[in-house]
Amino acid sequence: MEQDKLEYKPDYASAVSTAMRRPLTDLFSHIRSLAAHEELLTPYLRQELEGVLLSGYRLLRVADSISAAEKYEPAENAMTVFPLWPHLREGLEAARLLLGVSGSTLQYDLPETQETVRADEEMLMRAVLHLISNALDAAEDGTLVTVRGSIVGEQAVITVSDTGCGIAPDRLDSVFEPYTSLNRDGLPYQSLGLGLPLARRVLETHGGSLRIVSTGEGTAAVCSLPLCNELPALLRSPAPPYLQDTFSPLYTVLCEYITPPWPYSQP
């Protein structure tokens, strides 16, 4: 059922995403123009402009989610062989820094080894960020979110867990339902509800899996990904500039829990 709901017409999804991005480009351009004259902004106007900026990032997250829904079958040219743990460590450290500034706590414990996987780097990182975002959505203020990595047989296992109130047993079966997004009180949340189903699809199309475990005292999203025996390319593209690219998945997926970057401070 979940798979059928995700398989909507790509042309329609592309048109919706493109239609959203055009006015968003204008919106961010106008925000940048106003921010460039910061000396003219009163504290009140600065606060209001920050609110508009956050709304822009929320809409960009929606557009990105719709685009990502099209890409749940990774393109062959996007698949590369790379060391998994260094790749995750770089993205998680960037997320930890941004979340820490905003008062949320993320910690991670990853192996220091160099096991490789064959995957779409951007989509894999996006999937992990969605799991972190979902953990923060369901967590109480000050709840710790932890990402752990391990090797089990021929699989890399990534576990994203929180110490919140957990998920009610009668809701566990519906957490992967697309377009169903509920907060910890069971009330509708302001998102499309595509994070978990897309994260699972990303893992499954890479030969892995995603399952949710909740005992009433916290929740864990357990990802598995097959290891690859190939060596990474000697000449690989540079690692994504997670912090420098202020429109990367790091900023859009986690926009509810970080302070959006003030546009005038961008290089």
Predicted ranges, named:
Residues 207-208:
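Conserved glycine-rich
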Residues 217-219, 224-267:
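Flexible, glycine-/charge-rich segments associated with ATP-binding catalytic modules
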Residues 100, 105-115:
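Conserved catalytic submotifs in the C-terminal HATPase_c
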Residues 51-59:
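Short alpha-helical segment of the dimerization/phosphotransfer core of two-component systems
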Residues 162:
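Acidic ATP/Mg2+-coordinating residue in the GHKL
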Residues 167-179:
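Short conserved segment of the HATPase_c
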Residues 72-78, 116-119:
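Conserved micro-motifs of the catalytic ATP-binding
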